[in-house]
Amino acid sequence: MTTWNFVCLGLGSNLGNRHEYIKRAYESLKKAGIRNLKSSVILETKALLLEGSPKEWDLPYFNCVAIGETQLSPDELVKEIKMIENRLSRDSSLKWGPRSIDIDVLLYGDESYSCCSERCIIPHPRLLERPFLLSMMASLCPYRYFRLRGSPYDGKTFAELAAIYPLTEKDVLGSFAPTTQIMGIVNVTDDSISDTGLFLEAKRAAAHAERLFAEGASIIDLGAQATNPRVRDLGSVEQEWERLEPVLQILAESWKDAKQYPDVSIDTFRPEVIRRAIQVFPIRWINDVSGGSLEMAHLAKDLGLRLLINHSCSLPPRPDCVLSYEESPVTQMLRWGESQLETFAQIGLDTSWQVVFDPGIGFGKTPVQSMQLMEGVAKFKHILKCPVLIGHSRKSCLSLLGRFSSQDRDWETIGCSVALHNQGVDYLRVHQVEGNRRVLAAAAWSGMPV
């Protein structure tokens, strides 16, 4: 009978959407047969380069460590890893150069196991030269012993090694939760409740998008049509596009040569806006607040975009049009989600990743119903088997916790974010990116199942 062996992997990315590459690597590793996979927090660190390396290689890395179990031998595992790296656009021709994903086998088998083959060396030969790796390994397996015959560190636990080679403040540029990505909100409108008119001017909106990316958002959601309960007139396609186009043009110029960048999402229920946007900027997401019309779904399929389906009882939301009081809102949203996903699967969308479910906090839900929906994330993920996004930032349901203005609900937003993260939510759509990112990273320090 084939046995399951412990494995510890190091993952890194310093090109493109680094958080997304790491997420995709984890999905690929699970498909390769690694079970019980658990990730450390993600640490952003400076690139380690050889002397004389090109200046353009000096790009910060996202690094993390994962532990799990595999039935593959070390050589088989390395072979599988190389195939994953190739599928994720890894360029192996430049040693020490930038890469979309890098996966190394750090440890394998029981504590006494070591090997030195053409494919791999275990323990990893540069393990003790990387304090950030030791710190993350100590968070996942602190009492596992490091074994290397002849080494002065043979027989020491990773908890002790992390103390011998401590990670200092200057070593860490930032930290991120491994399982929850942040979508930053940019409202290019004059009637948004939270930031009325602040980013209506294109240059300010583009600068805000760049700031949110710098603060840790892996997705930027641009919306040029407000859909909050105060809106009475949803305007026209031309008005929406007049606001959105110059922002996309500025970002297209700003990010055209960027080596690291976020995905860009367009928050609209109008397919025509998406058709125009894709001509100006390589957007990756459609955020359809209407819940995903068939026309929008076909557009997502044809363009290879991700489709975020936001449930709403009406547009704009009306206080007299809400979910039933006779049944759990979670049950009602599951029924709607299953119906939508079945329809999208029939037209050819891959609902395991391409469709993202959003129960629509505040869109046709009372404050109590909205809070109940936030408690249902684990059930949504388990039953719908698709990614889940929650957009709770500064929403009126948080007034159940105190009388604060919408701009002053970030504390409550972050508190809910931690609870959502602990249920395994995939994406959080928020206004205040840095605070959410930092708190979620702290919540994930001891590791998260992936």
From Swiss-Prot:
- What's the EC number here? 2.7.6.3, 2.5.1.15
Keyword Nucleotide-binding, does the record have it?
yes
Where would I find the Pterin-binding domain in this sequence? 180-441
Q: Which cofactor does it need?
A: Mg(2+)
Gene Ontology biological process terms from the UniProt entry: folic acid biosynthetic process; tetrahydrofolate biosynthetic process
Positions annotated to bind (7,8-dihydropterin-6-yl)methyl diphosphate: T227, D267, N287, D358, K395, R429, V430, H431
> Which CDD domains does the annotation name?
DHPS, HPPK
Q: Which reaction does it catalyse?
A: 6-hydroxymethyl-7,8-dihydropterin + ATP = (7,8-dihydropterin-6-yl)methyl diphosphate + AMP + H(+); (7,8-dihydropterin-6-yl)methyl diphosphate + 4-aminobenzoate = 7,8-dihydropteroate + diphosphate
Query: What are the entry keywords?
Result: ATP-binding, Folate biosynthesis, Kinase, Magnesium, Metal-binding, Multifunctional enzyme, Nucleotide-binding, Transferase
Pfam families, per the entry: HPPK (PF01288), Pterin_bind (PF00809)
Q: List the disulfide bonds.
A: none
Q: Which Gene3D superfamilies match?
A: 7,8-Dihydro-6-hydroxymethylpterin-pyrophosphokinase HPPK, Dihydropteroate synthase-like
Gene Ontology molecular function, alphabetical: 2-amino-4-hydroxy-6-hydroxymethyldihydropteridine diphosphokinase activity; ATP binding; dihydropteroate synthase activity; kinase activity; metal ion binding
Q: Which family does it belong to?
A: In the C-terminal section; belongs to the DHPS family.
Name-wise, this protein is: Folate synthesis bifunctional protein
Tell me the organism's taxonomic lineage: Bacteria, Pseudomonadati, Chlamydiota, Chlamydiia, Chlamydiales
